[in-house]
């Protein structure tokens, strides 16, 4: 009994001692009194717990290419970690700061973020893509050119319109006194005088006049420069040209003799001789000087016969040609006028072109392109020359020898044309015969009745035999004549 009492006393003493020891350990003021061995044991326990529960690293990427590291088992040891962190914070606050322990820590760069994120590259923007006026120089040039073209179109069109109206106002009284109808546009069934020009396009104006003796009508065409076209304006700076007035008078057949005659600048006559069908056939000689008739050196003459030249170059005509030689491009009278030569891809045409008795005048407007409305008054005497030429062509008559020579020239031209087109006409006739035979054979083959088909074949055979017999008879007659 005494022994049992002694054992209980010992247990109580031991329990009180151990409880006092743990109470002292929880007090924050007495942490420093314990040895480092106690903390070493605690660190060993923590290392063992870390090695026993390895953690897996999970890396997730969001839209901004940032990486996040998640540790598995974090929730399980969250409470223990907070307690350890509090304990370590208390330790670091009480322990002195050691400079050697953290030496080089601040100088070590943080490479974890650079490994996880892509490097940022800055690209230099080209100069032509930057927002500056220099980036739009091509667009500026295009807009400027377009505006210049539009402005030139408006100005050029208006100037041509003013020139045409100025010409008409100057010549209207003279035209109305010589023609019953002035300005028919051809839109009405009955000829009506509109009293105004007909605009074909921005640089060509037409005027039709009729109702005068000895002529069917007169077509006046004002051919201005293409002032509405900027490219044409730039081209004229290198090579100036003039506005032109072309007048075409269609004569009645009974009021004009058979002859071809032309007078004008030497350059214009050479060009017309190459282009016009009648001048190339009836006036094959080179242009001759008009000094014999008192014409200036700038003008030359093309004539079918010398009699025509003597008859046309009277005093008044020479006066017009001499005083207005700078404005006259060409004067062309012809009973065989058919226009420019017909150029066909396959040889000559099979028939002669239709001809008209025509008087053709071409005048240059003064100014060499720098024309003003007041310059149109200088062309009024040339219109008087046109009216005089109409009356002169009606009065002029060839003598007997001249008519015979003119008829021979026209027969010669027709014969030469038939010789040139003989082979082509034979080929055309052969092709027509073959086409006719082919159509007849197709008609026989398409016949459903055998008896009718046989009769058609026999009729075709008889026709071929008759043609062959006629051909043989002609050959025999030719041989007899040759003998």
UniProtKB/Swiss-Prot annotation:
One of its GO terms (molecular function) is calcium ion binding. Residues 105-118, 430-472 have a biased composition (Basic and acidic residues). Its main location: endoplasmic reticulum. Residues 451-481 form a coiled coil. Residues 1-20 form the signal peptide. It is found in: Endoplasmic reticulum membrane; Rough endoplasmic reticulum membrane. GO terms for cellular component: multi-pass translocon complex; rough endoplasmic reticulum membrane. The chain crosses the membrane at residues 136-155. Residues 473-483 have a biased composition (Basic residues). Residues 46-118, 424-483 are annotated as: Disordered. It is a single-pass type I membrane protein. Residues 60-104 have a biased composition (Acidic residues). It comes from the Eukaryota. The keyword Endoplasmic reticulum applies. It holds the Pfam family CCDC47. Component of the multi-pass translocon (MPT) complex that mediates insertion of multi-pass membrane proteins into the lipid bilayer of membranes. The MPT complex takes over after the SEC61 complex: following membrane insertion of the first few transmembrane segments of proteins by the SEC61 complex, the MPT complex occludes the lateral gate of the SEC61 complex to promote insertion of subsequent transmembrane regions. Belongs to the CCDC47 family. Component of the PAT complex, composed of WDR83OS/Asterix and CCDC47. The PAT complex is part of the multi-pass translocon (MPT) complex, composed of three subcomplexes, the GEL complex (composed of RAB5IF/OPTI and TMCO1), the BOS complex (composed of NCLN/Nicalin, NOMO1 and TMEM147) and the PAT complex (composed of WDR83OS/Asterix and CCDC47). The MPT complex associates with the SEC61 complex. Interacts with VCP, HSPA5, DERL1, DERL2 and SELENOS. This is PAT complex subunit CCDC47. It comes from Pongo abelii (Sumatran orangutan).
């Amino acid at each position: 009994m005494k022994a049992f009492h002694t054992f209980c006393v010992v247990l109580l003493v031991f329990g009180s001692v151990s409880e006092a020891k743990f109470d002292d350990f929880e007090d924050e003021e007495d942490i420093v009194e314990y040895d480092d061995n106690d903390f070493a044991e605690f660190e060993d326990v923590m290392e063992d717990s870390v090695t026993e529960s390895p953690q897996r690293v999970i890396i997730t990427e969001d839209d901004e290419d940032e990486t996040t590291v998640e540790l598995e088992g974090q929730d399980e040891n969250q409470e223990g970690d907070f307690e350890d962190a509090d304990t370590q914070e208390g330790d670091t606050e009480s322990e002195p700061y050691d400079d050697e322990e953290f030496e080089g820590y601040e100088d070590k760069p943080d490479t974890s973020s650079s490994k996880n994120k892509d490097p940022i590259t800055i690209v230099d923007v080209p100069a032509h893509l930057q927002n500056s006026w220099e980036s739009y120089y091509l667009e500026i040039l295009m807009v400027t050119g377009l505006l210049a073209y539009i402005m030139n179109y408006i100005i050029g069109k208006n100037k041509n319109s003013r020139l045409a109206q100025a010409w008409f106002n100057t010549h209207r009284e003279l035209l109305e006194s010589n023609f019953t109808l002035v300005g028919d546009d051809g839109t009405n069934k009955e000829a009506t005088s509109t009293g105004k020009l007909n605009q074909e396009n921005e640089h060509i104006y037409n005027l039709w006049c009729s109702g005068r003796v000895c002529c069917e009508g007169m077509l006046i065409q004002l051919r201005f420069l293409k002032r509405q076209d900027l490219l044409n304006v730039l081209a004229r700076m290198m090579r100036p040209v003039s506005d032109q007035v072309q007048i075409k008078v269609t004569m009645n057949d009974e009021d004009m003799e058979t002859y071809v005659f032309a007078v004008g600048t030497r350059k214009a006559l050479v060009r017309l001789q190459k282009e016009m069908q009648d001048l190339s056939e009836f006036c094959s000689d080179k242009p001759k000087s008009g000094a014999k008739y008192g014409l200036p050196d700038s003008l030359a003459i093309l004539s079918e016969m010398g009699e025509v030249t003597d008859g046309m170059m009277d005093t008044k005509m020479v006066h017009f040609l001499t005083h207005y030689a700078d404005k006259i491009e060409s004067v062309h009278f012809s009973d065989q006028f058919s226009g420019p030569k017909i150029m066909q891809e396959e040889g000559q045409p099979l028939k002669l072109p239709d001809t008209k008795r025509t008087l053709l005048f071409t005048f240059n407007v003064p100014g060499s392109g720098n024309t003003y409305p007041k310059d149109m008054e200088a062309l009024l005497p040339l219109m008087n020359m046109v009216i005089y030429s109409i009356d002169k062509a009606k009065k002029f008559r060839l003598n007997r020898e001249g008519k015979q020579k003119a008829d021979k020239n026209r027969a010669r031209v027709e014969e030469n044309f038939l010789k040139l087109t003989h082979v082509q006409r034979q080929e055309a006739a052969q092709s027509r015969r073959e086409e006719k035979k082919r159509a007849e054979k197709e008609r026989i083959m398409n016949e459903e009745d055998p008896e009718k088909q046989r009769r058609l074949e026999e009729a075709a055979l008889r026709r071929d035999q008759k043609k062959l017999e006629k051909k043989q008879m002609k050959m025999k007659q030719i041989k007899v004549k040759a003998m």
